[in-house]
Amino acid sequence: MESKLGLNMELVDQARASAAKVADDTQQFIDQHTTVTVERAVCRLLGIDGVNDMDVPLPNVVVDHLMANSLLPVGAAWAIGNAMVETGKDPQGVADAVNSGELDLSKVPAHSDAEIRGAITPVVNATMERINKNVAKRNSYLKEWGDKEGPYLYIIVATGNIYEDIIQAKAGAKQGADIIAVIRTTGQSLLDYVPYGATTEGFGGTYATQENFRLMRAALDEVGEEQHRYIRLCNYCSGLCMPEIAAMGALERLDVMLNDALYGILFRDINMQRTIVDQFFSRVINGYAGVIINTGEDNYLTTDDAITAAHTVLASQFLNEAFAKSAGMREEQMGLGHAFEMDPAVENTFLHELAQAQMAREIFPNAPLKYMPPTKFMTGNIFRGHIQDALFNMVTILTNQRLCLLGMMTEAIHTPFMSDRALSIENAQYIFRTMKDLGSELTYKENGIIRNRANEVLTKATDLLKEIEKLGLFTTIEKGIFADVKRPKDGGKGLNGVVVKDDKYFNPFVEVMKGKVGA
């Protein structure tokens, strides 16, 4: 891609190399550790499902049992496989026996690795076949109906009731939306378990559960078949259960997942060691399942200034790209995030927004960039808000952003009505249609505001990444360099769920998934 901004590609290469070094150094830590939610995700992928009489999910029952008996370092796959050899039960049977007290995994005689792997491999293969069928079904729909060119129209539903969400999601799809995201209930990030079953009460969103995923997937397939369009489903694998939600999404054919390497640390005060380990397995799963991940750089601009902190967004995009590559993801699955969040009271911010978006497109040419609408400076004036969203839509189409979360004129007033979404979709469709090829007609003046701004941000981001390379990721976060938020290495939620792996440890799903996409 020819650079319209005259970007110094040597600086881009230096920034990417620094980010890769940071990711490689951090990967050494990841490879040595596992967490309770990584092992619960393994349980789920082995087919363990359901809850006990106290509504505790059985993956939690098994992993809590492993933790209490100092078995977590060997991993769920080894412990369950060993019990399968001894008892002849399948993983669900092992979980049921642990729950009833019939089976104590710490007292099962140790069998050979060959026997354990022999017992567990058919179960792993069955799960992989299920995920492969989901990938094939998505590809079949896309082959039959084609995929959309230009930006995906991306909307949110958030009623708290999955059945109400389905009504709103189907309406949004019929109005023209391409991606439906179901916002999670407030605080689900901080639950160290995944709720079970269909849910009808949430706060600011709807619980992410496997049954809710299944219900919404079926509803969107139904409306997609009516419209002859594939409607993508999005949810959120951030928080204390990142890999579990990724596993559930892979099993139920979700298409897009919010999945940032740093978001939980910065914005939910989840321990950085926990998050860094969890994000790796979640991305391995998403990569194999053909899921597009969305990263959360847009959130930095809610706590920091979008003009002065723009280089931290770019630096984080480089890091998220590097961590995704470490997990075997393809660039085409990396929905690196940024946002239209500059203060509209400042002169020439539209030019700065355009520079930032074009810069991201040129630096990450294969990534389906996720572009977020204005929220911080939405005042409740719906007329001004609609214009702010229109300017955002203009930048989207001029710079070929791919996942365009549509702004709502009623931002800062209430959760959107179906009519609000209809107007938002109409706004975007009008601009995307009438300006479809305008971006290819434009060049940017040498030494002008747009080119100078982009090169200034790139230079600062490259310098910052060189500093992070020296400091290491954990120290960088402790210093508050991202989002102006400081987090201690040994603080936050979830650190007690991180353990060093035993020599016997293995994760069969990383072995078969990493660097591959299901077929």
What feature does the model see in each segment?
Residues 156-162, 347, 380-385:
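Short, glycine-rich nucleotide/cofactor-binding loops
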Residues 151-158, 179-183, 229-237, 256-261, ...:
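Hydrophobic faces of well-ordered beta-strands that scaffold small-molecule active sites
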Residues 1-163, 171-176, 184-212, 239-245, ...:
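Long, compositionally biased, glycine/small-hydrophobic-enriched stretches that function as flexible linkers
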Residues 356-420, 438-448:
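Hydrophobic alpha-helical bundle architecture
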Residues 143-144, 194-232, 276-293, 350-367, ...:
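Alpha-helix-loop-beta-strand connector modules within alpha/beta enzyme cores
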Residues 178-189, 252-269, 320-321, 392-415:
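Glycine-rich phosphate-binding active-site loops on the catalytic face of alpha/beta enzymes
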Residues 163-170, 240-253, 308-309, 383-397:
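Catalytic cores of alpha/beta
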Residues 202-330:
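Conserved, well-structured core segments that form the ligand-binding/active-site neighborhood
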